């Protein structure tokens, strides 16, 4: 098994908070995630085939390559058919191993840094299953929703991170501890 590092964004549904890939709509499962070929059904039997197939789970080789402004960082275990690239890996199977507190908290609405304790997450609390949460400071929080509606609900970032760590059954690691834990 290989350890890789990746960024996530927050996804909220009636099931609570989950991790979503930054570059696609894929919501990470709790436990093992298996790649499914989306470009060509005939390649589905041969994941990570050469050519145009790009299915699989991507991660960087080191935590230094993570986007410091992404809302969530994590380490993932990768196995099965694995392709190594210059900056990372693409694997047939992956599982979230741990989550990291971000070094810098960023208000997504105004793109300014804030203290992690001042960051809140706004979600649509109606029973829908396709909403990406917006994290922002209190000043800009309800701009995420356009206008305040009674079904919008706000959580502190600490509440969200704790729920994610509990959902995925993984530890929540401070950035300064990453090197000691994995590198």
Kindly give the residue locations of the regions a language model identified:
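A structural signal for short, hydrophobic beta-strand segments that form beta-sheets
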Residues: 88-103, 116-118, 144-149, 159-160, ...
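Cys/His-enriched microdomains
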Residues: 35, 105, 132-135
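ADP-ribosyltransferase catalytic core
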Residues: 44-109
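Glycine-rich loop/turn
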Residues: 7-58, 63-73
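Cys/His-coordinated zinc-binding microdomains
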Residues: 41, 108-111, 138-141
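Residue-level signal for mature regions of secreted extracellular proteins and peptides
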Residues: 15, 30, 46, 100-103, ...
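Cysteine-rich micro-motifs
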Residues: 123-142
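Short recognition patches in nucleic-acid-associated and regulatory proteins
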Residues: 108-126
């Amino acid at each position: 098994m290989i350890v890789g590092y990746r960024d996530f964004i927050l996804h909220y549904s009636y099931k609570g908070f989950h991790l979503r890939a930054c570059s696609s709509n894929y919501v990470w499962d709790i436990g093992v995630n298996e790649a499914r070929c989306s470009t060509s059904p005939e390649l589905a039997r041969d994941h990570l085939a050469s050519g145009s197939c790009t299915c699989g789970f991507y991660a960087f080789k080191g935590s230094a390559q993570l986007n410091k402004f992404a809302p969530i960082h994590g380490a993932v275990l990768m196995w099965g058919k694995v392709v190594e690239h210059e900056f990372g890996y693409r694997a047939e199977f992956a599982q979230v191993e741990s989550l990291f507190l971000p070094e810098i908290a960023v208000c997504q609405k105004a793109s300014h840094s804030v203290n992690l304790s001042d960051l809140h997450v706004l979600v649509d609390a109606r029973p829908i299953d396709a909403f990406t949460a917006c994290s922002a400071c209190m000043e800009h929080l309800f701009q995420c929703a356009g206008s305040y509606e009674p079904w919008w609900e706000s959580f502190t970032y600490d509440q969200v991170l704790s729920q994610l760590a509990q959902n995925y059954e993984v530890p929540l690691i401070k950035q300064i501890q990453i090197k000691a834990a994995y590198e």
